[in-house]
């Protein structure tokens, strides 16, 4: 606080830059840690000869994958809608690139989980087959919904169409907040493995 008071604008810029750098580094470390843990789970699924253990690891892998999909959807939904509201084409292009990477990731994850499904008890695999494909399709639908949202927003801003009238903004902003809060709540339930309030969420 004293540095900002005596240093003025330059000190404030330095503090903001350091804060942003710290947040970026923390985010990168967290992603690396999650990726390493995710890879360890996959290795465990592929090396274990205990079918019950493979099933336990597969459930964990799928839960982590779904949580990652919801987290990605949260941030990308915010990025797309911010880009539309602020007429920020760079933000929309960044979201579009991120969606391209997410599509490839979903394909890799699904292939890995299909391999693990072949290593669990056959009767259990038949029983859980619908559950498995429903979970995979949920992640894909999140991706396609975001893609379909991003394309017209990018076209609208990129072609310099008129900004949204304020009357539309007043209608859109509460809906945006509800959708974002829904995704946050779903992720919380998955993280805590607590689905007792699922009916109220739905």
Model-assigned labels for residue ranges:
Residues 1-6, 12-202:
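Cytosolic, long alpha-helical scaffolding segments
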């Amino acid at each position: 606080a004293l540095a900002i008071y005596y240093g003025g604008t330059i000190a404030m810029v330095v503090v903001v830059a350091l804060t942003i750098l710290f947040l970026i580094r923390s985010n990168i470390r967290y992603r690396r840690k999650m990726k390493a843990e995710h890879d360890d789970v996959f290795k465990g699924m592929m090396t274990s000869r205990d079918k019950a253990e493979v099933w336990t690891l597969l459930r964990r892998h799928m839960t982590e994958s779904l949580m990652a999909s919801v987290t990605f959807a949260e941030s990308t939904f915010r990025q797309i809608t911010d880009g539309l509201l602020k007429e920020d084409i760079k933000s929309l292009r960044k979201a579009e690139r991120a969606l391209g990477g997410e599509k490839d990731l979903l394909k890799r994850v699904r292939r890995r989980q299909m391999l693990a499904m072949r290593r669990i008890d056959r009767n259990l695999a038949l029983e859980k087959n619908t559950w498995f494909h429903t979970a995979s399709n949920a992640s894909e639908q999140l991706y396609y919904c975001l893609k379909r949202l991003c394309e017209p927003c990018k076209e609208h801003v990129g072609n310099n169409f008129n900004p949204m009238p304020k009357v539309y903004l007043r209608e859109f902003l509460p809906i945006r907040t509800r959708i974002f809060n829904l995704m946050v709540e779903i992720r919380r339930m998955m993280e805590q493995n607590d689905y007792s309030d699922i009916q109220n969420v739905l």
